[in-house]
Amino acid sequence: MEYKVEDVSPVKKKVNVTVPVEEVDAALGAAIAMYRTSVNLDGFRKGKVPASIVENRFRKEIYAEATQDLVNVHINEIVTSLEVSPLSRIDFDGGELERGKEFSYTISFEVMPQFDLPDYEGFAVEQEKAVVDEKEVDEVIARIRRNMAELVPVAETRPGADGDVVVLDFAAFENGEPIEGVSAENFQLSLGEKQSLEDFENLVKTIPAGQEAEGPITFPDDFLNPDFAGKTVTMKVKVHAVKERRLPEIDDALAQKAGGFESMEKMRETVVTSYMQSREQLHKATAQKSMLDKLLKMVDFALPESMVDMYVGNLIEDMRVKMERQGRGLESLGKTPEQLREQVLPEAQQIARSQIFLLAAGRKEAVEVSEQEVDGQLQQLAMRSGQDFDTLKDYYVRNGLIFNLRDRLIADKAMDAIYAKANVTMVDPAPAA
């Protein structure tokens, strides 16, 4: 086999392959021999059918398989020799093997762009210090205290007010007919917390315990359920009870009951530690992104179309899932598939640029990701999605997604590696506006 490489672009290669007659005939002979071992034909023992009969009877299948097997062998040899890893599906352009004839075909595929990494060792970057204000801790304790409050019926007969909890029944009607799915009994509503529509809450605030009333409720135009968006209905409400919160004392007993802390001081320390850890991670990620954005401006390389397309698809799929959680579909955005692609394309291109840069840095820093680390990431994905780990892993392997997952882990490690070599200055947080 001989081949000639043509660089179609900085990220796409085309390989013209020529296969001599001897290799063609050998490939066909091997395929026929494989068929002979398993084929069953009347009048012949298994494995004893003459090769010529097998070839004539199963010519279409044999020649197709021989062509595919031979091309696959060549592809492995070519990409190994070129020391490249195809990013995209390898496109094959050619016919089928013919006995006694030379065979020519072409393959094309995309590869990572080649570029020189900028010098990132000692790169100046600022990272904001993690700071936790005592007022923030007080707010957390106040929320915990409020959540653990005892609900006590109010002594006087009055409508509910902000801060109260109202127990009620409600049902929606349109043209005098009940609307299916918009009703509940003994529903607990915390007033003043924007848990419900403003019209509904205003109506509830006019009804004392033991009484009922009705009024018009208008759903906003962007309501999650498109069937009700912008619609006005009649809501009938019966209030069973109005309750107020009796807050517990802020003491060691509250800390013990809230989370098994030995004291309120220990509880406050835990809140501070949790806030500090999350903010340190957030500020580090922000500084890393700032550093990466600056480094990306120092290089220029072409983007593989297949890689950008993959991220476009991922972003649109994320958008679809988010819309479904809101009870809506992508079509509710009023955009064509082409418009959606145009909308997410800049972000997809930026993700691709970042990924390519970090994978190149990962090679320079000799970053490695073990199979155990990949499995660990899959375990987390399985737990979040409620899927079986083995089923999920098999899906990732069969669809080639395992390599994308591995590359993401390499990119994450590479970011940490180059950030560790940066000149990081810790700065005070900017004053709140």
Swiss-Prot record:
In UniProt terms, what function does this protein have? Involved in protein export. Acts as a chaperone by maintaining the newly synthesized protein in an open conformation. Functions as a peptidyl-prolyl cis-trans isomerase.
Q: Which GO terms describe its biological process?
A: 'de novo' cotranslational protein folding; cell division; chaperone-mediated protein folding; protein transport; protein unfolding
Tell me its EC number(s), please. Answer: 5.2.1.8
- Stated name of the protein: Trigger factor
Under HAMAP family, the record lists: Trigger_factor_Tig
Which gene name belongs to this protein? tig
Domain PPIase FKBP-type, by residue range, is: 163-248
- Catalyzed reactions: [protein]-peptidylproline (omega=180) = [protein]-peptidylproline (omega=0)
Which terms does the record give in the GO molecular function aspect?
peptidyl-prolyl cis-trans isomerase activity; protein folding chaperone; ribosome binding
- Know anything about its domains from the record? Consists of 3 domains; the N-terminus binds the ribosome, the middle domain has PPIase activity, while the C-terminus has intrinsic chaperone activity on its own.
Originating organism:
Nitratidesulfovibrio vulgaris (strain DP4)
Give the location in the cell.
Cytoplasm
Keywords from UniProt, A to Z, are: Cell cycle, Cell division, Chaperone, Cytoplasm, Isomerase, Rotamase
Q: What does the similarity note say?
A: Belongs to the FKBP-type PPIase family. Tig subfamily.
